[in-house]
Amino acid sequence: MKKRILAVLIATALAVSVTGCAGNATSSSDSTSASSVAESSDTSTQTSSDASSEDESKNESSQEESKDLEANYTKYTLDGDLTQHMIDMSRLNEGNKVRLANVIKKLKNGEEVTVGFIGGSITQGTSAGNDLCYAKLTADWLQKTYSNAKINYVNAGIGATGSYIGVHRVANDLLSKNPDLVFVEFSVNDTTENTERNKKSYDGLLRTIWKSSTNPAIITIATTQEDGTSFQDQHAEIVKHYDLPMISYRNTILDTIKHGDIVWKDISDDNIHPNVPGHKIVSQLLQAYISDVDKDVDNISGSESDFTTPATDAPIENGSLIQPSSATDVTATGAFGNYEQQFGGFDGFWLFKGTSDADISATSLTFKVNAKSIGILYHKYTKAGCTADVYIDDELVTTLNADFTGGWGNYVECAELKSFDSAGEHTV
């Protein structure tokens, strides 16, 4: 750890995954591979022709759909209701509705239903507050619409966190509350800087939620930055693989701005977070989808979404966080202390706070874990952030840098440290 005067490093948690995060290895002989190549070569001309025809057909269909949407366009005003065009634009994937129909039937029967939300700062309510964020608005609408039912509301949004952190905290923060319906929003927190990791994390997150004991329905949400930056397309690949619903606030807002009905500042006070009117639109889009499913609920039956085959080759599943409150085999020495207060949405952390070389040389934080994949959460600081070398089984795997001088604020960062072929005991 290499900064004098006052050096700070906070280890929030160790992220471990016991299963998942390993590719499915297959083997084949050289002759089989050669045969496959030859067959592919012989049919390449026909395949190319078929693909070209299919692409042309898709393009024509897409153009016709666009014409239909434009023909039905109605101007939107912030103080009015959503237009049908906005609703249509939001339906990135209608999805399999069987589980959602089951939830709606419970609501209609006046039963108790737990509705959970997991995501980043947008879900948490930044720029709108706890009572006017899209999550609370949606839960309140459900309670008002199905007044005989009892709605339990769980908001597991934490700012500056993406799917990688999400898949490791979902069991404790959300699934432990036994949700019947879960909304997932991470499209501005997941970035292309870690595309594969984020895709595998999002895949694992959806799989973990889907396979949990209460068999919850899932509705995914796509949001956006002002310039259109979003992980929507990458998430959509996974969502469509499982045929889950995806509601795109991104598509709706950018299209409404393009038509000149609103400007970005109408729905956001910065370049990312919806403000109160923006959160209202997110919730209204979700309400519209649920209402449409309700109208047809008696006709919805059959098989649920099929999660047999993962969408990615190595989804990160069964993750958990080792924090001070739950740690059983952790040793902190020297200037590392254990603190119980909250930071960045997480309860408790290990804090290094040293001022001399002696503090540094006498300080260590050691975990013993049984895991297949290991990561770490640590705090980034706008001042006095230091560095720390991280070893796994006596091998240096990375150096963490907690310095975020000149940044927008302190936050929790994550680092994927190392993955193994199978779960086992490791020292970090």
Task: State what each model feature region is.
Residues 126-131, 193-197:
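Short, solvent-exposed loop/turn segments at secondary-structure boundaries
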Residues 121-122, 157-159:
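Catalytic nucleophile serine of serine hydrolases
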Residues 136-152, 161, 165-299, 358-360, ...:
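Alpha-helical cap/lid subdomain in secreted, periplasmic
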Residues 17, 154:
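Conserved Rossmann-like nucleotide-binding pocket used by diverse enzymes
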Residues 117-118, 185:
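Structural cue for short, hydrophobic secondary-structure segments
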Residues 2-9, 14, 21-116, 123-129, ...:
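N-terminal secretory targeting modules
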